[in-house]
Amino acid sequence: MKFNPFVTSDRSKNRKRHFNAPSHVRRKIMSSPLSKELRQKYNVRSMPIRKDDEVQVVRGHYKGQQIGKVVQVYRKKYVIYIERVQREKANGTTVHVGIHPSKVVITRLKLDKDRKKILERKAKSRQVGKEKGKYKEELIEKMQE
């Protein structure tokens, strides 16, 4: 059910917006979930992927246990290139295989001050969401009296 009249649910319009999206919007679209350990640590579910993050492929032909570093984030093609995810071309040269960020899990973040700020902001908003709509014990006790 559609609630907002200003947001379209037309498939062709959504595809058009996806494939014609500017770079700053593509950054948000190219987000990856965090591993269970990082999710526990930072209380954040996903982050936009960036070069030098360590990731593990969890879907597709290249899924497996090896963890590789992100070599390049190619926003134009909506793919990332990972250290050990390569294939051999017919002429013998090896090339990186593009993988969509939603098909990987971030196992180690490359942190700088801006990224730390983003993590803090996301964790704070999640904390507010958990508290929302819950009665405090003092209020319940007062109501029962």
Swiss-Prot record:
One of the record's GO cellular component terms: extracellular exosome
SUPFAM superfamilies for the chain: Translation proteins SH3-like domain
Gene field: RPL26L1
GO terms assigned for molecular function: RNA binding; structural constituent of ribosome
Record-linked SMART domains: KOW
Family according to the record: Belongs to the universal ribosomal protein uL24 family.
Organism: Homo sapiens (Human)
Keywords assigned by UniProt, alphabetized: Isopeptide bond, Ribonucleoprotein, Ribosomal protein, Ubl conjugation
Gene3D superfamilies, alphabetized: 2.30.30.30
Gene Ontology biological-process annotations: cytoplasmic translation; ribosomal large subunit biogenesis
Protein name stated in the entry: Ribosomal protein uL24-like
Region (Disordered): 1-21, 122-145
Glycyl lysine isopeptide (Lys-Gly) (interchain with G-Cter in SUMO2) crosslink site(s): K136, K142
